[in-house]
Amino acid sequence: MSNNETITNYTIKPHGGELINRVVEGNERERLIEEALKFKPITLNPWGISDLELIGIGGFSPLTGFMNKEDYTKVIEETHLSNGLVWSIPITLPVTESEAEKLEIGDDIALYGEDGQLYGTLKLEEKYTYDKEKEARLVYGTTEEAHPGVKKVYEKGNIYLGGPIKLLNRPKHDAFSNYHLDPSETRQLFHDLGWKTVVGFQTRNPVHRAHEYIQKSALEIVDGLLLNPLVGETKSDDIPADVRMESYEVILKNYYPEDRARLVIYPAAMRYAGPREAILHATVRKNYGCTHFIVGRDHAGVGDYYGTYEAQELITQFEDELGIQILKFEHAFYCEACGNMATAKTCPHDASQHLHLSGTKVREKLRNGESLPTKFSRPEVAEVLIKGLREK
């Protein structure tokens, strides 16, 4: 086994056994950028660009491009790719019917962002129609347009393009450049740190005491923690990524052992697909080199669309196939009678002793400049959030 293979497989093999790399560099990149000027162009929205990047860097291994109809259908109907691997969310490239009419099978297509930047190319293998309501129902569990993920599906063009991609330019994550590591780089990092077991934690929210309790409980049984916050597109009322990132820096610096935790961004859009998205999140963290993944209450949920532990129940069905160990945690809270953080598994007291704050209530307090109870949030974290939101 080569040294590169040793590092790639140090903690866990990527999904499908190979870490995909569709990033084009050097002379080939220069040549392709020049050639792409003659290709038919398509503009991708931020969601599409983040998917393109994750395919390119191997975060979505084993995908090498946007899904063809066979894979798409298998994924939405059976939660698997056509090759038999577990996959829960369709990764697709939508266009309008008028755009699709201009494209021929076999075309090389230039993929631009809304900023006018060329990000990559697609070799067009397939154009196909799809049923939006069916996709919404099977992937999101609802056809209601009030669901932010479903709304996105309904707003998309009516045709999907399938084919392999090449990644020529990367979206800029300048504000987070210190924390922008690709799966090959996190795997190298874990090797260098000597972490054989790593737990991944997905978040789009600040880390409050309940999250800290869960992360540290997991850290008791593994070598390291990968705090892997999503920094792509989220709902407008979610706390902005730059404010959240500062809060992560503060809590790691003050409350976590330096040699046991690392902060790395996950440059994806949030789909709010609940149980199905939990499976995707676990798959991606496996590709980043995590051996364990935390799934808590209402993982990747929104509103009241999913049951509290529905994501845990679904992912348990696929855990053996996924090959990453799922750590399932109940909702954590501060118990006045216990005098510490706890869950229903460890606390005998009734709800009157438990401190609960909903995400909505937390955001409301922060935007009003109100401090959060120290039993709920570390004061340094609350300070960063209040200051950050006041400046927005």
UniProtKB/Swiss-Prot annotation:
InterPro entries: ATP-Sase_PUA-like_dom (IPR025980), PUA-like_sf (IPR015947), Rossmann-like_a/b/a_fold (IPR014729), SO4_adenylyltransferase_pro (IPR020792), Sulfurylase_cat_dom (IPR024951), Sulphate_adenylyltransferase (IPR002650). SUPFAM superfamilies: Nucleotidylyl transferase (SSF52374), PUA domain-like (SSF88697). One of its GO terms (molecular function) is ATP binding. It is an enzyme of class 2 (transferase). It comes from the Bacteria. GO terms for biological process: hydrogen sulfide biosynthetic process; sulfate assimilation. Pfam families: ATP-sulfurylase (PF01747), PUA_2 (PF14306). Keywords: ATP-binding, Nucleotide-binding, Nucleotidyltransferase, Transferase. Gene3D superfamilies: HUPs (3.40.50.620), Sulfate adenylyltransferase (3.10.400.10). Its EC number is 2.7.7.4. Belongs to the sulfate adenylyltransferase family. This is Sulfate adenylyltransferase. It comes from Staphylococcus epidermidis (strain ATCC 35984 / DSM 28319 / BCRC 17069 / CCUG 31568 / BM 3577 / RP62A).
